[in-house]
UniProtKB/Swiss-Prot annotation:
Residues 1-19 form the signal peptide. Belongs to the long (4 C-C) scorpion toxin superfamily. Sodium channel inhibitor family. Beta subfamily. Residues 20-85 form the LCN-type CS-alpha/beta domain. The lineage of its organism: Eukaryota, Metazoa, Ecdysozoa, Arthropoda, Chelicerata. Expressed by the venom gland. Keywords: Amidation, Disulfide bond, Ion channel impairing toxin, Neurotoxin, Secreted, Signal, Toxin, Voltage-gated sodium channel impairing toxin. It holds the Pfam family Toxin_3. The modification Cysteine amide is found at residue 84. The keyword Signal applies. This is Neurotoxin Cex1. The keyword Ribonucleoprotein does not apply. Residues 85-87 form a propeptide.
Length: 87
């Protein structure tokens, strides 16, 4: 019983530690979400936590929104086969 509890705890921790992170990207254009206030940024945090993104925290890094604790289903920059601003 203790072994089962330890295994379950490890799996939960792995999910938390290895959560996806990256630049939030528009699926239609392939471009990163831009921001100008570096560091803590309400706009980036709001976008990352939006129900369709599912992130845990967002901030502005290198003039684009960086998100942490994203689900694997949320696309991050770059999207394969889609270049921002290029046809």
């Amino acid at each position: 019983m203790n072994s089962l509890l330890m295994i379950t705890t490890c799996l939960v921790l792995f999910g938390t530690v290895w959560a996806k992170e990256g630049y939030l990207v528009s699926k239609s254009t392939g471009c990163k979400y831009e921001c100008f206030w570096l560091g803590k940024n309400e706009g980036c945090d709001k976008e990352c936590k939006a129900p369709n993104q599912g992130g845990g925290y967002g901030y502005c890094h290198a003039f684009a929104c960086w998100c942490e604790n994203l689900p694997e289903s949320t696309p991050t920059y770059p999207i394969p086969g889609k270049s921002c601003g290029k046809k």
